């Protein structure tokens, strides 16, 4: 078996947010992906679990202590924070008109996901025209698990952001 000498991810400013996540193991898996990719995680209350939930910690494994985590009290405060910061946001929803494959991410973007049960509120989606993205699925299929969707979007954004920093011979290896 050949071992590839692939590059490590370089530091970046991408951020991922979960609006009112309900299922601790999903959030734990997303936290693990965030640590592994060097991405900040923001959780927006209310949460469907407590942060010391054993299922959350089990799914995040020993990655949790290294997680760069911010918890926001509510959606209104979170979106006010983003507006003040001038953040560029991408909201992921099965109702998105834009496709992940056509979205062009830049360093510093925010990837925002709704809860497992309700997704992102219609009013929030309507307030971000042109910024609502869906992950392409097979015909007739509704949606992906939140942790799977977040990982797909996160690593596609990183591929785009970081691939331009690699040597030409290694660009396809991210």
Regions found by a protein language model. Give the residues of each.
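Post-transcriptional modification and biogenesis factors for structured RNAs
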Residues: 1-174
């Amino acid at each position: 078996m050949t071992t590839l000498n692939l590059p490590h991810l370089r530091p970046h400013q991408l951020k991922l947010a979960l609006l009112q996540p309900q299922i601790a193991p999903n959030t734990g898996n997303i936290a693990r992906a965030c640590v592994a990719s060097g991405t900040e995680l923001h959780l927006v209350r209310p949460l469907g679990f407590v942060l010391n939930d054993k299922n959350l910690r089990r799914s995040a494994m020993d990655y949790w202590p290294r997680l760069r985590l911010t918890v926001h009290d509510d959606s209104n405060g979170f979106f006010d924070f983003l507006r003040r910061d001038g953040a560029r946001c991408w909201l992921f929803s099965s109702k998105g008109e834009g496709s992940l494959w056509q979205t062009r991410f830049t360093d510093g973007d925010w990837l925002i996901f709704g809860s497992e049960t309700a997704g992102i509120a219609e009013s929030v989606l309507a307030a971000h025209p042109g910024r609502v993205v869906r992950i392409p699925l097979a015909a007739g299929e509704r949606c992906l698990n939140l942790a799977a969707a977040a990982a797909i979007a996160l690593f596609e954004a990183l591929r785009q952001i970081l691939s331009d920093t690699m040597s030409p011979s290694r660009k396809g290896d991210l």
